[in-house]
Amino acid sequence: LAGESIILPILAPTLAEPVCDKLDMLANASKQLHNLAYGAALGVFPVCLFFAAPIIGSLSDNYARKPLIIAAVAGAFLSYILQGLAMQYMLFLPFFAGRAVAGLTTGVDGVIQAYLLDNCPAEKRAKYLSYTLFAMSIGLFVGPMFAAALIDPHSTEPLSWSVPFYGLAAVFLVILIPVIYFLPKRSKNALANKKTKLDWLAGIKDLKSSWREVDLRKLSIPFIIVNAAFGCYMASSAVWVEKSLGFNMREISLFFSVGGVASFFTYGLFAPKLIGKFGAQNVAKYSAVLIGVATFAMLVLRMGALPYVFMAFNFAGISLFYLSCIDIYSGLVSAQRRGWMLSVASSLWGLAQGLGLALSGFICAYIGAFGGMVFCAIFALFSYYIFPKLTLKERD
């Protein structure tokens, strides 16, 4: 997620609203095309993740996990080299391709989690999974800080803006060495099952299968709406603070880093306690309200540090909502189906985020960034009213 979270502070002033001619990835294009391309460049990552994750997971179950992890890290290295070159020469299509490759390689996250579970005792599985969750939330605020540290916001040289991508490529190259030489060749439980036929449309078929179950469908509707709305908020808010508040790249990076810190503490401290005390369904409903109210408040109360405060509330809200829904999803199915259900939820998240990010480009093009944020607030609040009351299975 560090690689994903550096994108918004960089693309807002180079694609959505270029600050100068030298930092324009679509020179001489219309304002509408700039914003549509901005949404497409953001949205392609989670959409590729949606299609890749089930396929990569199936390959790892049927063959071995280590080769796929190596391929994913190598692919991530190449994707950031490609994005760096595209940013250096201000070329949109190669940048878009690099984003797509990054999304495809991120589909290995589930394989990494499976590898950890294969090689740890049963009583420590929850602990190891929590490590992956914390790592993801750390990436949310490390990415923007990484971009802010490496880019001079006053520079008009494209090479300066490409440095974070080359830096990330170097990080992945360093990671690749211990993965190749020190990661055990085969996890303990890999290859235990009979090989199954690879299904290239597994993600879509899993979604269709879950949609046939009434309770899963009832939960998935607000889950999709809120995550799509938040994707729209993420992309629109980067443009809005640049235009309306005059933020430069470094200030946009700080803005999103604050959200990442809020997400980190929400996952680690507040969410488990709130869910335990009030129940996942209540927490999910009211976290959607928190997102809507914080977004409206940001549009109205712009003084001083208040936008940063509302950004923190927004990220806390989406973190609470996501974790609560995951808890509900896992309680709607039997223990034997929970792994499948959580993979479906992850796919739903990727698809919803991708649609929201792409939609933000359309809204910014024809209405403005303000409209994208209003869209987020309205649909987050709407989700409160349609959130279902569900009967969960007993925990085993």
Regions found by a protein language model. Give the residues of each.
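C-terminal transmembrane helical hairpin of 12-TM major facilitator-type secondary transporters
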Residues: 281-325
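Juxtamembrane intracellular "pre-TM" segments in multi-pass secondary transporters
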Residues: 187-221
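Central cavity-lining transmembrane alpha-helices of secondary-active solute carriers
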Residues: 39-57, 257-269
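Hydrophobic core of transmembrane alpha-helices in multi-pass small-molecule transporters
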Residues: 91-107, 306-320
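Cytoplasmic helix-loop-helix junction between adjacent transmembrane helices
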Residues: 98-136
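Helix-to-loop junctions at the C-terminal end of transmembrane segments
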Residues: 51-64, 266-280, 364
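Short amphipathic helix-loop junctions that connect adjacent transmembrane helices
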Residues: 10-35, 235-251
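C-terminal ends and interior cores of transmembrane alpha-helices
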Residues: 74-89, 290-302
